[in-house]
């Protein structure tokens, strides 16, 4: 992938950009095999990759510069701003949005937040695009609601320029820290969720719900999990750390009982909406802590699917699963180091199958799907 920002030494986020994709995949595979070297693996499936550029469905832009000349991108460690509107990881459809946002920031009088001076209002612009219909969700992260009335007043101009903006919100993040969003979300549009569709499964994206940033690879990850589950004698499963329900909604069949657990209420609202659309009545989604939910249950289903954040599922949940011993565990991980650590805490299981998904090209990161079977 060619990147003018990298060539000019202005951005180093894609540390592996100079390596061809096959080399990157090979290095990631070696890393994963090293991490799982202590465990016999029955089957290594071929790694899955997607496009090497234009694949991201989300942009998280720090807003800096002045109200007349805002910059959208990032801040270097020394505080120097860098405009990343031309980043080749973004699809071409993002360019007109960035182009319209710059004059809009001036029109609405949204002074970019100055970290050094602790002054200004507009901290971040968060943009998400649906692959299914090209609809977009735009979030303005502000320090306070001081400029809210001005923003509302100027908004019709932006909506006229960009009819693809289906969901527009303001998020209030008052803390002087590099935290992307606060708890308060104010909707400026009637529509509150973005419709997405992977493998004929309807999914919804709401402002404060996590959603994978590489749809081409994520859709293959969900489809693979579905294929693996279809091969197992399973009538009841849990989907822990389920997010908007991507795994559970793909794996569920009309006669399967499935419980999805996720701590974020916004994500659970999305999952419930999808389940209703699919007419799946035996699916239950609840906004709870996954570990607390699981460890309070007196029995387990045949299959427990986990998709934890980078820290992994942790010892308490590993101990519980070891004791209760479900027949199958499917572990989807964005951090193979913590996954390997967790598998060590599950001594009664063998690794049936492993597959690497290159969700983050040009970096050392990857996603991995592992099927564990009770010995």
Swiss-Prot record:
Residues annotated as catalytic: 334
GO biological process terms, semicolon-separated: rRNA base methylation
Designated name of the protein: 23S rRNA (uracil(747)-C(5))-methyltransferase RlmC
Listed GO MF terms: 4 iron, 4 sulfur cluster binding; iron ion binding; rRNA (uridine-C5-)-methyltransferase activity
Job description of the protein: Catalyzes the formation of 5-methyl-uridine at position 747 (m5U747) in 23S rRNA.
The protein's enzyme class: transferase
SUPFAM superfamilies for the chain: S-adenosyl-L-methionine-dependent methyltransferases
Entry EC number(s): 2.1.1.189
Superkingdom per UniProt: Bacteria
Residues binding S-adenosyl-L-methionine, per UniProt: 212, 241, 262, 307
Pfam families, alphabetized: tRNA_U5-meth_tr (PF05958)
Family per record: Belongs to the class I-like SAM-binding methyltransferase superfamily. RNA M5U methyltransferase family. RlmC subfamily.
């Amino acid at each position: 992938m060619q990147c003018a920002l990298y060539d000019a030494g202005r951005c180093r986020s894609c540390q592996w950009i100079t390596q061809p994709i096959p080399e990157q995949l090979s290095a990631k595979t070696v890393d994963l095999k090293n991490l799982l070297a202590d465990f016999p693996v029955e089957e290594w499936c071929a790694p899955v990759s997607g496009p090497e550029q234009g694949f991201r469905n989300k942009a998280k832009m720090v807003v800096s510069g002045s109200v007349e000349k805002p910059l959208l991108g990032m801040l270097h460690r020394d505080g120097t701003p860098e405009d990343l509107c031309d980043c080749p990881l973004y699809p071409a459809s993002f360019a007109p949005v960035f182009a319209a946002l710059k004059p809009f920031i001036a029109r609405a009088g949204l002074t970019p937040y100055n970290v050094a001076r602790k002054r200004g209002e507009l901290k971040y612009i968060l943009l998400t695009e649906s692959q299914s219909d090209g609809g977009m969700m735009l979030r303005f992260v502000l320090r306070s609601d001081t400029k809210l009335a001005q923003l509302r007043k100027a908004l019709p101009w932006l909506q006229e320029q960009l009819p693809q903006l289906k969901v527009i919100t303001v998020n209030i993040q008052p803390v002087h820290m590099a935290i992307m969003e606060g708890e308060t979300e104010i909707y400026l549009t009637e529509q509150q969720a973005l419709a997405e569709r992977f493998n004929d499964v309807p999914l919804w994206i709401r402002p404060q719900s996590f959603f994978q940033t590489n749809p081409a690879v994520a859709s293959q990850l969900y489809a693979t999990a579905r294929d693996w589950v279809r091969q197992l004698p399973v009538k009841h499963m849990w989907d822990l750390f389920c997010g908007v329900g991507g795994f559970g909604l793909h794996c569920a069949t009309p006669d399967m009982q499935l419980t999805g657990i996720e701590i974020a209420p916004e994500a659970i609202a999305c999952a419930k909406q999808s389940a209703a659309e699919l007419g799946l009545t035996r699916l239950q989604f609840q906004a709870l802590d996954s570990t607390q939910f699981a460890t309070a249950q007196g029995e387990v289903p045949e299959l427990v699917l986990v998709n934890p954040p980078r820290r992994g599922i942790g010892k308490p949940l590993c101990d519980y699963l070891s004791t209760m011993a479900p027949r199958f565990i499917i572990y989807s991980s964005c951090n193979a180091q913590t996954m390997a650590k967790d598998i060590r805490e599950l001594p009664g299981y063998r690794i049936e199958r492993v597959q690497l998904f290159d969700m983050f090209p040009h970096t050392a990161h990857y996603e991995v799907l592992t099927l564990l079977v009770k010995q």
